[in-house]
């Protein structure tokens, strides 16, 4: 009997356990997708039928009967009012101030329907009520509507709403739209009433699109002349117009005839500054100010010259190409130089490009080296011939250090050079400084901090192709630093992130030349070289520059193919990766390139 009872006990336990497991397996959660909308319709019906209403909101002689629970569930303002122990929680009628009846009606309708109907007539009332009552979804819908309603006619009013209600996302959209359409907006009557701070915000920006300085001047004058009391702030407004970048005829015919430009002392100074800037081109470097900066926020890659290295033609290119910005994968022709060149060196000082030396006819040796120097003004698209170097140079280096240009080494018909020349823009003259410790050509150079570094090239011995020289302008002295790991000639150097990268080039072995694919960087503080990802294809005698933390190597000669190339390899200094999906319009060696800020009208054409 006892054994039978035990069997029955365990059988019951097992059956119970199976039932529990079965119930556990079958336990599921279901949802009705339409429940939310059904609930809202039900609450709206109760409101329409006047059932279970428990509070009245009074505003502007209008009364709205509602359910506390509905408003508290979707508004932080009402939740705090009805549940936070405030006196209104026990009142049957609550007087509201700080918003309009029309705005409140839209908010209540949204609470019961999740929908809001907006137009330009009611938007300010609805947005004001939504912000006041902390109805975030309605605020977001209002922002969405206002962004879609943006136009030349509405932009300024929408901007005022964005400022009033501290809507940063909407303000950014308004600013972006205004930058694109500023001149059209400036013709609107609303423009005459914008605050001065708002006007100067736009006038000082580099983001304005398709705006000439003379057009911006006319817009500013229109705003100033609308109210006579504004004359006292004329200089605070007009200081953001870049008079030095206007044409001389515009200054004479359109600017100096405006009375305020003559009567206001500071405005008269702006006019004088512009005239001085234009008649003294060699002193423009010392007159730099925000008014002399090109109005653009995009840095472009710009190239000069090059040679196809054809045996039957000594022609070199006079074309200047540019890559509008890093998102555009195609070079465009910008202008032409006064004469063709290859293997020239370029450097940028105050956004002027100096194109120095090189050759105007193709020679494989230094026989074609020239001493001619030009300065290119990208704003006016003008060339200015400056004082020539003391020696003709090709396959040398040109770098900016302490506001001056340094031309180092190279070769000419007399042979290789050790001399170093320094150009002073203010004096427009070249002077000799401490020479390199040996003759050298085909080297590379870069500045980092307050020092100039020269690496590799053809010197006296094989070891010279690995040598690193460092120049201290304060001491006017050259010193040797840690040599590179790889011997290189006709390579490139670029300074980025406090590192100096050595890239590409070639090395010689008996009667053959080989591409150097290895890439390494030098850290001045530690005097050490570190190897990074190699190039995918060889490039020597190539253009090289840094743009947006990426190193661009343009064209050059590939010794594996034994020919010039159009390839553009791009090295990301942050990820240590290479890209190769870009090509120069022509297969050239001896291209010079540099990053520069071009006018908006140039990059957008």
Swiss-Prot record:
Keyword terms, alphabetized: Kelch repeat, Repeat
Organism the protein comes from: Danio rerio
Residue ranges of Kelch repeats: 300-351, 352-403, 404-450, 452-498, 499-549, 551-598
SUPFAM superfamilies, per the entry: Kelch motif, POZ domain
BTB domain residues: 53-120
Keyword Repeat set for record: yes
Chain ranges of the BACK domain: 155-256
Signal peptide: none
Disulfide cysteine pairs (residue numbers): none
Summary of the function given for this chain in its UniProt record: May play a role in endo(sarco)plasmic reticulum (ER/SR) mitochondrial signaling. May be part of the ubiquitin-proteasome system (UPS) and affect ubiquitination and degradation of target substrates.
Name listed for the protein in its UniProt record: Kelch-like protein 26
Gene this protein is translated from: klhl26
Entry keyword annotation includes Repeat: yes
